Amino acid sequence: MWVVRYQNTLEDGSISFISCCLQAFKTYSIGRSSKNPLIIKNDKSISRQHITFKWEINNSSDLKHSSLCLVNKGKLTSLNKKFMKVGETFTINASDVLKSTIIELGTTPIRIEFEWINEVWNIPPHLTQFRTMLSEYGISTEISINDIPANLMISDYPKSEDNSIRELYALVSTIPMKKSRFLMELCNTLLPTSKTNLKFDEMWNDMISNPEYNVFDFDPNILLSKFMRLNNIRVLTTIKSEPRLSSLLRTFNINLFAFDNIDSLYKYVDSLEASTEYLILTTTDKKENGKILCTIKTMLTSIIDGTLSAVINMKGASSRTLDNGKFDQISEGMSTILKTSRAPEVEASPVVSKKRKLNRRRVLPLDSLDFFAGGLSTKTLSENRSLTDAKRLNCGAESKTVISSPNIAEADEKHAPFLQNALKPTEDIGKKSGHSSPGAIIVSSPNLGTVNTSEDSLDKSLQSHKLPQPSLPEVAGIGSQTISSNSADYETAAVNSMDDAEVTKNFRVNHHQNIEQPSKNIRKLSNYSREISSPLQENCKSPVKELSIKEKSGTPHAFVEAIQETKNREVKRVKSTIVELKDEELSEEAINQLKNLAIVEPSNNLLRKSFDSEGNKTSRTTEKWENSLMEPEWHKRKNFKTFVKVRPKSKAHKEEGKNNTQSSDFIRNAAFLITRNYVPLKKYSKKDTTTKWGTEENEDMFALTEMERFGSNTFMSDNINSNTIQKRSQALNRFTNEDSSNEGEEDSFSFSRCSGTAASVQPLKNKIFITDEDDLGDIDDKSDRLNHRENNRNLFVVKEMNLRPNLSEECSKQSRHSRSATSRSRGSFGASNNGDGDDDDDDGPKFTFKRRKG
């Protein structure tokens, strides 16, 4: 196939990829004209019909010998980096094209790619009508299997009529196989529209990769593993019409044995060894002389489907089949006998235990499920220990143990007869010994409809025991006669081998009133037998005595205790970290509670405790859990705790009934007052251009600011000369005086020391009041009292009242008015205190005002 490809930039800036499959004997052209089949726009360097081309089939039937002829009509055209002249012709042979040929058009340039794709398809004989159309678009077709390798195989499998030799050839040669529907759709839709629909590459790739057109669903690469099943099987055939069959099977290392006729094939089969597998290939599927004959199509289908054993024969398979049938019948009969044979009861003689084992405590095997995920096993150990010790009791030579079958049908109907039969031997023993009281009770615990997985059925059955026989009280339900203390048979069958819980467990029958009374009687007898101490009872191997013997042993007892303590400690540790999740804990509401969850180490200090009326600490969570039916917030979660922010009581008391923002506002207002009093601020003005910190005139102002910053933390003595400070203040007043226009007129301002708040600026809240001259005496008294309070603090603080010599008109009027008012008040104040004499207090401020009136 000849395919031309190029890309073009459209008006909107997007790139269009164009590909077209060329039809034989048809002329194509590329240019800016819309009459061209292939159009290139938005490039003035390309002619309206820049280049024309067509391909032709030579006299040879092989399409590889076809050629593509190019005619250049444009000004800027280069082929393989060489410019072509206008009207120049160039021919490209398909056999010489190893890679695509590229032609560049225009100044940009636009690359045009011409490629020859060699396509050889093998089609069935009944689809030859498509060969002409396929050849026009450069696709070669073959019908028979020859040495020319094919790129694609068209098949009608499994409806093929050629014995599926073509499919076998395709599988062996790993040639993709497509259905005949693929060929029809390609010739009817894709190829005819390739001239108008310039997206040939996309449509071609979509059809080739579509799995709907595949004959087999599996990957051809795994076909080798499927044919490997024939390696150990001999393939026999009488087909002579397929000469390539042997070479195809030899590809998978399969040996094919060909015979002239079927008789010679049977003779070869008879000469084979026993249990040899072989496969017979013929022209028809049939079964003859007990042998399976199949065709190539059937063999291929069985290999692909994995049912190859259905067509394989084996030498001597018939005799082996009979033997297998007999063996199956025998095995079925034996299984039936084993299922039906079952002993209901087995009588066993008492087991004599070794004396050495009496001094050793039994260590039960570790149950991994109970050890790692279960609870403490102290209860289970006590039950197993008591049952084991009870089995070891030696109750005499005539005693027998009755082992009941674990499966007893209709247990509810046999409960009462079983207890009655169990009580009969006691009366017989009483008669033989000369006593009228009941005797031994044979204790048996068959499985009465209940299932207990923790104990074996043999462990549930207990040995028959006899009761000790000192004078006993009357027992209701058993008899009214007393039991004497002289019978040794009663002593050897003491029921004290079981505690109250075990007796009730062995005789427990749900919802049965006839068994409740005997169990109570036995409990009374067992309780009474524990209080008896006699020489006969000492000889009896009771669990109490045996336990005391075990406790006397040193090393084994300590070893067992260490094992049990380790197990219990590990179980507690695992249970503290592994908990069971409930369905309620996985709901969305429960998961949302985790946002206030914090995982901490378990500690008693984290639990908030309350005090009761007597002053003792009690846990609130425990009382809440005991008094209510609801579970706590994090039940059984020791390391879960919900933290709630609690405000201190002092702040809560102050802010009670107030808005939460008032506290922050109070702090912000207080900070504003502090910064306003101690940080000099300057109002920005466009007209204020005289103040420059780089000039020499402002050196005193900068020094004054530095003194204010460090003055609050600097303690100075009274002996420091104040003339330096007075000179700096006078220099400062020269810059800040608004009436500096009058020559020779200047305000002299001096003071000896700043004491308290008398010389400082009034607070903000007092600035709204105007002080009258009549109240200056009261102010002087207040300032004297404040000076006495701060005698120990000798701080020199200089306040800068106005550092801006040139202000706006509005600011100058305000400052002049305030300064004149202050001058008058201070002048009168200084005049009144000027003639006080030396008796005045030296700590008070001394002011002197001089002003010339012009």
Swiss-Prot record:
* Classification via SUPFAM superfamilies: SMAD/FHA domain
The entry lists its GO molecular-function terms as:
DNA binding; double-stranded telomeric DNA binding; G-quadruplex DNA binding; protein-macromolecule adaptor activity; single-stranded telomeric DNA binding; telomeric DNA binding
Q: Where is this region: Disordered?
A: 429-455, 807-854
Q: Which UniProt keywords apply?
A: Chromosome, DNA damage, DNA repair, Meiosis, Nucleus, Phosphoprotein, Telomere
Which residues, renumbered to this chain, carry the PTM Phosphothreonine? 555
Could you tell me which Gene3D superfamilies the record lists for this protein?
2.60.200.20
Subcellular locations according to the entry: Nucleus; Chromosome; Chromosome, Telomere
Q: Which Pfam families match?
A: FHA (PF00498)
Q: What is its main location?
A: nucleus
Instruction: List all Low complexity biased stretches.
Output: 820-832
Q: Which residues form the FHA domain?
A: 28-50
Q: Where are the transmembrane segments?
A: none
Extra remark beyond the main annotation? Present with 358 molecules/cell in log phase SD medium.
- Subunit structure, briefly? Component of the MRN complex composed of two heterodimers RAD50 and MRE11 associated with a single XRS2. The MRN complexes dimerize on DNA to form joined MRN-MRN oligomers required for DNA double-strand break repair.
Protein name per Swiss-Prot or TrEMBL:
DNA repair protein XRS2
What organism does this protein naturally occur in?
A: Saccharomyces cerevisiae (strain ATCC 204508 / S288c)
